[in-house]
């Protein structure tokens, strides 16, 4: 359930008050009237922040919009270090670089050890060797990429007929044995209309199960391999990778994503007659290895034991360079600390930066954090994560108590000059690394980003630095930094779910 609250609330309040004043009788309104409740929104005595703190929010916001540091850090992370698949040399280099940068900012840095899988992509090739109307002696290439955690084919590949289905239900309804030995394609189109309306994450969620468990489901019915239509809205004949999981006791069959264009091609050809494919995937699953969450504390001036956490995940997929997923989230979270340092601002509570390791391949970094800090969660005032790219932020999404809306209204008002004043409450936590904390009662927040374009590039070779708009990146940094400061310096903590 998502509830959108229109903002800036104080501007709305003044508008309603003005209309009321023009038409109201001269008599004094009764206590606790609608006017009283609206007036309370503008009563500074009822807020956790003073006028000076509001001014500081403005300073942070304005500095974020002109400071090039967020983009410069993101450029180094993506261009110089590159893709950061869990277990890779690049992932380790990223850990060391981020830790060094945070030490330069004057934070107390901890490397928190966690165990990560080590899966390595190999050869990827798919060709049609038979289809209706094929010219003799020809083949037809299909653009394919292995899903993370996929089992391999043999080095020579496997050749089998392709079976196209639109849903789990359709595959389940087929006669027993009909799936055996086939290459199954789950062809569920990505909802571009929903995405164009700004609900890309919802469109993604509708199809996620096909990538996540489709190969396991197909394997349980005897499929030789499973293909999924890429989860993305781009029409560039680029496949989108992502993690797949196998159930216990089920044969681990090779699993790959193909482009939307190729999925449509196979669907059309299959209606005309048999289609045969030779599929070659040679990934390797190596023994698990060690990596690290990077934790950096900007110590609180009065209550250092109380923590406001800002975060993004440091690992990425290996097809692109992980600029929007989630180098941007890491960079804008680092920028929160940089801005506080450069402006010499020391909030009452500690602001903790975390670069999560292994979000893409099983969230082991976040799991380790929960285990290591379980006794401290009472003192975690809030947890923020950015993991939906860095297009224009419309405001804040918060996961938790409905009462937090009134608490956050002044913060949204401080973000109104950059068009980021809408508050949205959601019962569903969409930020994976902080989800465990939120379930245990820690208030969670994320920038609400325009997701119309994000899934065109997500998990694909097109996730590169050129997709980042510098101004919009800075807007996201402003949202993260202003919110973190407000939560860390307020006289009251944000309400927790009861």
What is the role of each PLM region?
Residues 7-18:
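Bacterial N-terminal signal peptides
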Residues 338, 342, 455-498:
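His/Asp/Glu-rich mid-to-C-terminal helical/loop segments that flank catalytic regions of hydrolases
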Residues 72, 338-364:
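Short helix-loop-beta-strand segments that form the rim/entrance of peptidase-like active sites
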Residues 56, 130-131, 143-176, 244-323, ...:
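Soluble metallo-hydrolase cores and metallopeptidase-like ectodomains found primarily
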Residues 57-65, 79-89, 160-165, 174, ...:
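Second-shell loop/turn segments in exported
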Residues 29-49, 53-55, 75, 79-196:
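Noncatalytic luminal/extracellular "stalk/propeptide" segments of secretory-pathway proteins
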Residues 48-88, 238-243, 315, 387-391, ...:
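N-terminal capping segment at the start of a domain
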Residues 155, 160, 253-258, 263-264, ...:
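Metal-dependent peptidase/peptidase-like ectodomains
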């Amino acid at each position: 359930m998502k509830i959108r609250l229109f903002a800036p609330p104080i501007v709305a309040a003044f508008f309603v008050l003005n209309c009321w004043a023009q038409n109201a009788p001269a008599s004094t309104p009764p206590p606790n009237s609608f006017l009283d409740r609206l007036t309370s929104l503008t009563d500074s005595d009822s807020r956790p922040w003073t006028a000076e703190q509001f001014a500081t929010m403005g300073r942070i916001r304005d500095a974020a919009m002109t400071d090039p540091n967020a983009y410069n850090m993101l450029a180094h992370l993506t261009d110089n270090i590159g893709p950061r698949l869990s277990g890779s040399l690049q992932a380790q280099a990223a850990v060391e670089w981020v830790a060094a940068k945070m030490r330069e900012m004057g934070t107390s840095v901890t490397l928190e050890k966690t165990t990560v899988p080590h899966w390595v992509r190999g050869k990827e090739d798919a060709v049609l060797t038979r289809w209706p109307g094929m010219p003799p002696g020809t083949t037809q290439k299909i653009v394919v990429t292995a899903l993370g955690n996929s089992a391999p084919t043999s080095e020579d590949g496997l050749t089998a007929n392709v079976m196209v289905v639109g849903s789990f239900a359709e595959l389940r309804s087929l006669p027993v044995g009909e799936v055996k030995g086939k290459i199954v394609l789950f062809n569920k189109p990505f909802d571009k209309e929903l995405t164009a309306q700004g609900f890309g994450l919802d469109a993604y969620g509708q199809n996620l199960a096909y990538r996540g468990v489709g190969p396991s489901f197909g394997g349980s019915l005897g499929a030789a391999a499973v293909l999924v239509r890429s989860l993305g809205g781009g029409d560039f004949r680029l496949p989108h990778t992502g993690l797949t999981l196998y159930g216990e006791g089920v044969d681990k069959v090779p699993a790959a994503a193909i482009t939307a264009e190729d999925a449509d091609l196979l669907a059309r050809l299959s209606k005309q007659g048999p289609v045969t494919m030779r599929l070659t995937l040679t990934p390797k699953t190596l023994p698990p290895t060690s990596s690290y969450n990077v934790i950096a504390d900007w110590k609180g001036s009065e209550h250092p034991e109380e923590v406001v956490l800002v975060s993004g995940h440091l690992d990425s997929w290996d097809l692109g360079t992980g600029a929007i997923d989630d180098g941007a989230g890491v960079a804008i979270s680092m920028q929160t600390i940089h801005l506080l340092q450069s402006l010499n601002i020391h909030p009452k509570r500690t602001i903790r930066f975390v670069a999560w390791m292994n979000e893409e391949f099983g969230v082991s970094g976040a799991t380790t954090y929960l285990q290591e800090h379980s006794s401290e969660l009472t003192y975690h005032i809030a947890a923020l994560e950015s993991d939906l790219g860095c297009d224009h932020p419309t405001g804040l999404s918060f996961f938790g108590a409905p009462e937090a809306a009134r608490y956050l209204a002044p913060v949204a008002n401080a973000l109104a000059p950059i068009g980021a004043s809408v508050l949205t409450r959601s019962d569903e936590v969409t930020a994976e690394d902080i989800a465990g904390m939120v379930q245990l009662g820690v208030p969670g927040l994320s920038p609400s980003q325009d997701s119309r374009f994000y899934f065109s590039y997500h998990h694909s070779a097109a996730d590169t630095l050129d997709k980042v708009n510098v101004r919009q990146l800075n807007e996201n940094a402003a949202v993260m930094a202003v919110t973190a400061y407000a939560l860390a310096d307020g006289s009251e903590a944000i309400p927790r779910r009861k």
